[in-house]
């Protein structure tokens, strides 16, 4: 969203994560697009779960005022950022770890090219009661507990990727490649995206 690009942040995305986001990026890869993906992750985490991943930014306004002439013209993203900033925080991109990428198989009504991020619990600045209504019955659970749920196959796969990174203590290791899931000729595939492949 265009409004993600103009938000002042407390801390920028780590260079290693920004570079990984550029791997096999379709269209015209750019640092701005990579940053935008991270901004979207922080915004949607607040939007759907009320969780703020933020910090303080000296040059960020205390609040973002809605459009004075016609509030109805305010984009959904701009409205969410205004609500985010009302808690006194600017988005913090530094804790984000780019975990995996997956593309919805062909033939589905809606297809997504999704990037999955994770943060350590200590990066959560505040949990609020903000909720856009898209999700319900939000609860915290362990990875072991999540395995008992009726989850989409790709969600299970991503959670196992997360479990592996946690067990190996590599969440902050910039050299770890990114799992990339997609379908080709009807076959589910997993490729690993390496930073070296981009610099070669």
Where does each model-flagged region fall?
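Short glycine/proline-centered loop/turn elements that form peptide/ligand docking sites
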Residues: 40, 57-60
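Short, His- and charge-rich active-site/binding loops that engage polyanionic ligands
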Residues: 1-23, 35
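Nudix hydrolase/Nudix homology domain
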Residues: 17-29, 62-200
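Hydrophobic alpha-helical positions that pack around
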Residues: 45
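Short alpha-helical functional segments enriched in proximate histidine and acidic residues
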Residues: 48-52
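Residue-level detector of family-conserved "landmark" positions at structurally sensitive sites
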Residues: 55-56, 94
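Short aromatic-cysteine micro-motif
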Residues: 26-37, 41
